[in-house]
Amino acid sequence: VFAAVSWTSTSATPLQAQQVELATPEDGEPPSPPERSVPSRRPVKEKIPIHHLGATDSPPLPGQPWKIHDRYRPRPKVVQPGETPDAPPSDATILFDGQGLDAWCHHGEEDLWYVPMWLVEDDQLVVEPHTGSLYTIDSFGSCQLHLEWMIPEGTKGNSQGRGNSGIKFMELFEVQILDSFSNRTYADGQAGAIYGQYPPLVNAVKPQGQWQVYDIFFEAPRFEQEELVRPAYLTVVLNGVLVQNHRQLAGPTGARAPVYRPGTPAAPIMLQDHGNRIRFRNIWIRELPEDTSHR
């Protein structure tokens, strides 16, 4: 039989010893040792095998200065994604978040800029018809653009006269905005079209009163000594549906014959005033490197 001694005291009496009987272990069974706390260990830093960091003797990649799994190839920078698919990532530039039009202007004669006359209502950017198109104050070349737009319910008209607007990259290359839900028009002029050049692969437009979502990837044309060495390309996703798959542009879009002319590597993005009260929200942009093939 094992016993333990404990001490009790009160404010009026000194400490007194009390004998406490403990349970008697079964015959032939040794008593359990007292439990001891084990001090926690610091986590051991994981050692990564050197071959997991890349190779130095692997075959070269055709057309690139790197080898397969090249140990010395630069690793991508870290970008924090948005909390939702439509939220801007950490490296995005906010063009409109419902708070104001500081990123935009109208263009006047002789390249003069003036204050936007479009409206901000309910955290939305609203076209004020016949006040002129809006332009970003900053210039952009190759980029990823996220933009949400809506044709207000009850918008009247037909064909190109119903819910018409557009997004022009470098003021030259237009992705069409139009109410294309049960509204017939020419194929390369409906929503999702690269205006005048490519119809969308499918018509993915929602009815009036619902928000439409564009995610557009634009590769700017490149010139060397005024010679075109790479044309422009556009990839367009409308409402989660791929409608333009890395299309090579024949030149600036529009009704005229497309012809490339040397210009600056970057220019403003334009939102078109076509006389219809289109609504926009949540516009952000990411600048993309001009050439990613060797990264």
Label for each model-derived stretch:
Residues 4-22:
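Signal peptide processing junction and immediate N-terminal pro/mature segment
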Residues 20-295:
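Carbohydrate-interacting regions of secretory-pathway proteins
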